[in-house]
């Protein structure tokens, strides 16, 4: 029976609003538009595949205006780099060969920038044909301008005469790859329409599929990021009512949905990193408003990772304990705190100092980032107990009792000498910290120092950047008994992103950090854990290598089925509860 098109828009409009809500939430996927003959175009297969997979396609026109690009990315949950013309070899530092086909300068600059800016924001990316080449070029890889003249050996046909929705050759997939998980096969029939290809994969990526003649057909991130590229055109198959390539698009929608949900969570809660050492780089001329490769925390990276606040510490290396050396340590602590305040003042429209949990809420509502002040190593106060109150009046929210060396307050985990705990002076310091409202931090403290501090303190104490010794036997980590004792007194332990505290052998990744967190939750309870990255103090691991990647930690928490309330507690709720209790007079 034939149905005829109706032209009653009012009826359709009314039908949309017969129930509430009238739509389902879905991730918004940006698709790069082609540009030819003065028009922005996009082949049907791209947006149809995104729609069929459950996403909302949003076409990004080839514009040069940077502000437009960034605002577009901030509205997106995923990015699909589409196919099209050759890439101008000048962007890769090469001269064109005579076999180069047409190029599209309007697209090249925009898409290379889009790929890098999207990756900074941890936006899931899928590259198709030209798109995989754009990804590779953007991150430092190389391309063949023409595989037929620049690759050794014979080539199979890579520009098929068959219809676009039909396979013309096969690719072999690596069994340990994401692509294999999606298709569950080593041999995959694909279509092919290209003469350029990836030559050497960019750092941070690996080859996951090749054609029989050795051409790279797929690559993926080796840094636990949602980034994948394929050389064929999976979007063409759906137009032949063939769903064989839909796993690629389902992957993009799944990753983008996770990213979208993580962004929403961050918008509804305070996210706090309880420990970073960025001031250690102040003498290298860094600018907090510049995205600086030397540091892991700056305004750009905080915004990209959706991090609201960080506690920057004045770190003091443990040196001699002579009167002169102690006086110099106190002066250095003051100088570093001054430098933090000056850095914030220079960027006062975007960031401010927070002294209390209430300040954090106020600054988030104002659209500003927050920096809190800390001191790493009680060496800073010398032997002068009055420095505790003076530093508290400066706004210091916590002080780590010691660092990698014994001091006049307590014994360090670095040496963990038997019987060396909190000294008589150290007991006075802890009690004074309780009195003035400064949190006691026992990261770096030896085991006896830990238990002594727990016994002496009348307020809950924190471990601002420590992990679980049961999973990584390092003296800086806390045993299960220590974790239980800390929780019993209302304290909090913050998982550290330093690789050496997460695993003994091999390279640590975000998966290891999640395992430590899960273990600590099981031992302590959800009300006693948090995140203290130690960024710029040797913290930073694959998958969570800077403040820009902290949104990935939230995505992992969602994958582990943590509730929104649990994630809120992990992301600072627990730590700020202790801060409020300690600061309460």
Question: Across the structure, where does each feature detected by a protein language model lie?
Answer:
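N-terminal beta1-alpha1 cap of cysteine-dependent amidohydrolase-like domains
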Residues: 1-128, 137, 144, 148-182, ...
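Proline-centered loop/turn at the N-terminus of a beta-strand
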Residues: 27-28, 56, 124, 142, ...
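Histidine-centered catalytic micro-motifs
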Residues: 192-197, 230-234, 271-278, 396, ...
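N-terminal hydrophobic targeting/anchoring segments and the immediately downstream early-domain regions
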Residues: 261-418, 473-494, 498-531, 535-585
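Catalytic beta/alpha-barrel core
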Residues: 352-353, 438-445
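Active-site glycine-rich loop that binds ribose-phosphate moieties when present
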Residues: 420-433
């Amino acid at each position: 029976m034939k149905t005829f098109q109706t032209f009653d828009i009012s009826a359709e409009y009314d039908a949309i609003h017969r129930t509430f809500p009238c739509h389902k939430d879905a991730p918004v996927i940006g698709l790069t538009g082609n540009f030819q003959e003065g028009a922005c175009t996009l082949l049907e297969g791209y947006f149809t595949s995104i729609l069929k997979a459950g996403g909302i396609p949003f076409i990004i026109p080839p514009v040069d205006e940077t502000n437009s690009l960034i605002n577009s990315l901030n509205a997106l949950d995923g990015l699909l780099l589409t196919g099209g013309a050759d890439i101008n070899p000048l962007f890769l530092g090469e001269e064109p060969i005579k076999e180069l086909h047409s190029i599209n300068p309007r697209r090249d600059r925009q898409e290379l920038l889009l790929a890098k800016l999207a990756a900074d924001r941890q936006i899931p990316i899928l590259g198709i044909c030209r798109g995989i080449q754009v990804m590779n070029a953007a991150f430092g890889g190389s391309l063949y301008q023409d595989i037929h003249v620049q690759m050794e050996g014979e080539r199979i046909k890579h520009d098929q005469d068959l219809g676009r929705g039909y396979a013309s050759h096969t690719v072999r997939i690596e069994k340990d790859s994401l692509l294999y998980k999606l298709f569950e096969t080593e041999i995959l029939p694909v279509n092919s329409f290209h003469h350029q290809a990836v030559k050497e994969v960019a750092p941070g990526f690996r080859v996951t599929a090749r054609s029989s003649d050795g051409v790279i057909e797929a690559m993926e991130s080796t840094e636990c990021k949602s980034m994948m590229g394929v050389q064929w055109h999976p979007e063409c198959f759906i137009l032949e009512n063939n769903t064989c390539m839909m796993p690629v698009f389902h992957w993009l929608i799944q990753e983008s949905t996770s990213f979208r949900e993580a962004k929403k969570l961050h918008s509804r809660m305070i996210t706090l990193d309880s420990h970073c050492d960025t001031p250690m780089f102040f003498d290298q001329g860094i600018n907090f408003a510049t995205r600086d490769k030397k540091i892991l925390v700056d305004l750009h990276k905080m915004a990209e990772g959706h991090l609201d606040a960080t506690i920057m510490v004045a770190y003091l290396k443990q040196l001699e304990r002579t009167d002169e050396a102690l006086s110099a340590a106190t002066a250095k602590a003051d100088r570093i705190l001054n430098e933090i305040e000056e850095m914030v003042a220079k960027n006062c429209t975007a960031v401010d100092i927070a002294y209390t949990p209430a300040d954090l809420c106020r600054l988030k509502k104002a659209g500003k980032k927050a920096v809190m002040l800390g001191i790493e190593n009680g060496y800073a106060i010398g032997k002068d107990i009055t420095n505790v109150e003076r530093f508290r009046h400066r706004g210091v929210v916590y002080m780590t009792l010691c660092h990698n060396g014994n001091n006049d307050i307590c014994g360090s985990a670095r040496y963990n000498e038997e019987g060396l705990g909190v000294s008589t002076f150290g007991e006075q310091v802890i009690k004074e910290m309780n009195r003035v409202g400064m949190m006691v931090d026992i990261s770096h403290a030896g085991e006896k120092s830990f238990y002594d501090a727990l016994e002496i303190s009348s307020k809950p104490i924190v471990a601002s950047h420590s992990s679980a010794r049961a999973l990584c036997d390092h003296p800086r980590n806390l045993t299960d008994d220590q974790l239980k004792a800390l929780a019993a007194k209302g304290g909090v332990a913050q998982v550290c992103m330093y690789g050496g505290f997460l695993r003994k052998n091999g390279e640590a990744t975000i998966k290891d950090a999640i395992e430590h967190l899960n273990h600590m939750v099981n031992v302590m309870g959800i009300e006693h854990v948090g995140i203290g990255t130690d960024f710029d103090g040797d913290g930073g691991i694959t998958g969570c290598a800077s403040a820009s990647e902290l949104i990935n930690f939230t995505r992992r928490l969602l994958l582990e089925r943590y509730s929104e309330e649990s994630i809120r507690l992990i992301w600072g709720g627990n730590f700020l509860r202790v801060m409020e209790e300690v600061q309460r007079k």
